[in-house]
Amino acid sequence: MKIYRFKGGFHPADHKDLSAGKNEMELPLLPKYTVILRQNVGSAPELCVKKGDIVKKGTLIAKEGAGLSVPLHSPVSGTVGDTVLVPGPNAGMVEAVEILTDMEHQEWDTSFPPISDWRDTPVKVLKQRVQECGVTGMGGAAFPTHVKLSPPPEKSVDTLILNGAECEPYLTSDDTLMRNHARAILVGGAVCAKILGITEICVGIEENKPEALQAMEQASWGIPGVNITVKVLPVKYPQGGEKQLLYALTGRKVIVGALPMDVGCVVIKVGSCYAVWDAVLNGHPLVERITTVTGTPVVDPGNYWLPIGAPLSAVLENAGGVKENSRTGKIIFGGPMMGFAQYSLDVPVSKNTSGILLLDESEVAQFTGGPCLSCGRCVEQCPMQLPVSSLSKACENERYDIALKKHVLACLECGVCSSVCPARRPNVQHFRKAKKELKELSWKEKNKQK
């Protein structure tokens, strides 16, 4: 089976040995959970409960809003508390609702009966279940999964790609899921394929996950109605990028401004497939996820099942806290390449919290923002083949008109350019700011036209 190699990228130290291969762990029940209302790209859902309402685990607490939106459900049985502002994982304060836990009695809401005969269930019903259970992407922008499974009629999709690459250093939550829940992931993938009306499923996993590869290959047999191929990928960052993975597995290129569906593919992470399986076959909304808690300062790094809304402080305490001789320099939600540094221990876990990473002071890179040396490393290793050096200068000088022409919106924010830069320029931060400014300008222009 041919594997295509994308241009650019590099090979950072992975540090996955800190958490890989350990048993899954759970967080003890907490007295309170704080559920952020807007957890995905698009609009926030609308709160549909009030203070004092009794809820069960999985009870709807915020209904789907307009546009790209998904509902939210209670992570535990208990009572609805206050609507509050809490630190958000991407900086700033965000709106959230408190759930005060019933410490004596926990049970699932039974609003969604299991669909055991999903093969004979209409596509409309399956898609509605995925939507009503709030399934999203389990990293990045947490894109609503039901939207991914609804390509326009004019888009001809023939292949579903399951993303098990997990190329981000330190993170092993997908690896753990594939080792221990391979069959559930692939059945969830088969449900997605049925919704899309296709039979071809291709799974991409990097070769540094041999146990996951073996488990997924063994589980791929005997699932009727689909043809599943598991492919071994070379270790290279960012192999798990949607466009890079698609090219590696199929040889199809997604041009700037296009989507995977434009070349006949839909890409879904293995964690989302597991959530689809849980929603359809068990009737469980997405209210918890497996997250890698890791880093050299952490006493007991590993992969933990965390309820949505659990505070960072409780997660770290359950992982044994910080080693006595360590000085934590940074706490990151996600991985070291694409994650976001946190400034508060009160920030809650969200649906896209793939990792919680602690770095020692000695491990934190310092970006000086010095002048570009014109060495060309960033251009050579950019997986999107962008003119990084000139693009960074344009963004730094707030020439967003030039940045737009140089395709800043195509930037993955993967961090390769900043990592290889000998001048330690904060390129990614420049690009993030530019993209935010351009988005706001576009929004203002649309409002003017109304």
Spell out what each predicted region is.
Residues I198-L312, N318-K323, G335:
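Hydrophobic alpha-helical positions that pack around
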Residues E107-W108, L160-D174, P297:
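Gly-rich Lys/Arg/Thr-decorated short loops/hinges at beta-loop-alpha junctions or inter-strand turns
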Residues V55-S69, V84-P87, V94-T101:
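Short hydrophobic beta/alpha edge segments that flank linear recognition/processing sites
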Residues A91, E98-L162:
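Hydrophobic alpha-helical hairpins/lids featuring a short glycine-rich hinge
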Residues G78-V80:
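Conserved hydrophobic positions within beta-strands
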Residues M1-C48, E98:
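N-terminal, Lys/Arg-enriched amphipathic/low-complexity engagement segments
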